[in-house]
Regions:
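Phosphopantetheine-dependent thiolation modules in NRPS/PKS and related acyl-activating systems
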Residues: 2-44, 49-82
Length: 82
């Protein structure tokens, strides 16, 4: 995924939600970071993030919650509703 092709608003929204859920500063988050392996999100934080996303109309199925799920994957979900 090219960083240039990604909507900056969607990226900002996702990185700020991640910050709210687990405290990693948005400036330290890359689209290529794995939520589990790189950002060290635990299962409770992942569910919190899913709930925050659902509040803004974005659905990520629990079956997608693997250690391979990246910030960029979440951004693509957000972009798909706008």
């Amino acid at each position: 995924m090219s960083d240039v092709a990604v909507d900056k608003h969607a990226t900002s929204l996702v990185t700020n939600l991640i910050y709210q859920v687990n405290g990693v500063l948005p400036k330290d988050i890359s689209l290529h970071h794995s939520l589990v392996n790189d950002l060290l999100m635990d299962s409770i934080e992942l569910i919190d993030l899913l709930m925050c996303l659902e509040d803004i109309g974005v659905t990520v199925h629990e079956s997608e919650l693997t250690s391979e799920l990246t910030v960029g994957d979440i951004v693509m979900h957000v972009e798909s509703i706008h």
